[in-house]
């Protein structure tokens, strides 16, 4: 739900994503299949998921060891969008709807739906 909301806010869809990064120790130890099954993450092709580990530490290290990267920071900052959830229409309702496992709209999770059908659970 959060991913769908953020994509909608910037005018993109899941099909526009080349990669889906799950950073930090959480991402490294996460079972992607289980996370998709319960609706935590979108039902993307699994090869689109990247779990880079401690990406903030890796980024800081790269910047400290290659000062030429400083010139890229301004470009990156210009591309950042702030989205205030306090002003988001229907955000709370969408989050409540997403609290069901796997999700209130199973059609958003076609691989999960297929698994449930195969097991006779739908």
Enumerate the language-model features and the residues they cover.
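Acidic, glycine/GT-rich loop-and beta-edge segments that sit at the periphery of enzyme/chaperone cores
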Residues: 62-122
